[in-house]
Amino acid sequence: MKTPVPTAMADDLRALGLDAKSLPPIEKLEPRTLRGVMKLMARSLGVKCNDCHQEGDFAAPTRRKKIAAHMWDEFAAKMAFDAGGGAGGAPLFCDSCHQGRVQLLDRRDKKVLSKWMDDSFVAKLVQKDGKSMECETCHVDMDMHFLAKWGQ
């Protein structure tokens, strides 16, 4: 598992008219901007369009599209790297954690995974609204399968 890093795509987002430090909800993006964002997401995860979209019907809802929308709205838009004293640090985007891979977590050893998540997310990220970063920030009620819920 690789440690999350500040996004390398802030300039790419800026070229689409977006500020990586202040992303709007994904459903508010204009179609042209959304297509550009999807290309950045694909590059961040090392995937092709049909890895998330249904071939022949790109508008159809799929599990991965739903998860990507939640990741945008709940992670990229609401979190940043700690600037040593609170919100407003370096921006977070898909490439920050995924770094060219769809799956970034090794779930074989729960203790190792828990420590890595604590070190990588709780200790290094902040919520832009100033609330403290806790396990429950993502794992509501300590549900360890929130992505499965998002994909429904």
Regions found by a protein language model. Name each.
Residues G46-G56, P91-R101, K131-D141:
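The canonical Cys-X-X-Cys-His
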Residues T137, D141-Q152:
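Short, low-complexity, Pro/Ser/Thr/Gly-rich segments in the mature regions of secreted, periplasmic
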Residues T62, F93, E134, A148-K149:
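Secondary-structure junction/capping motif
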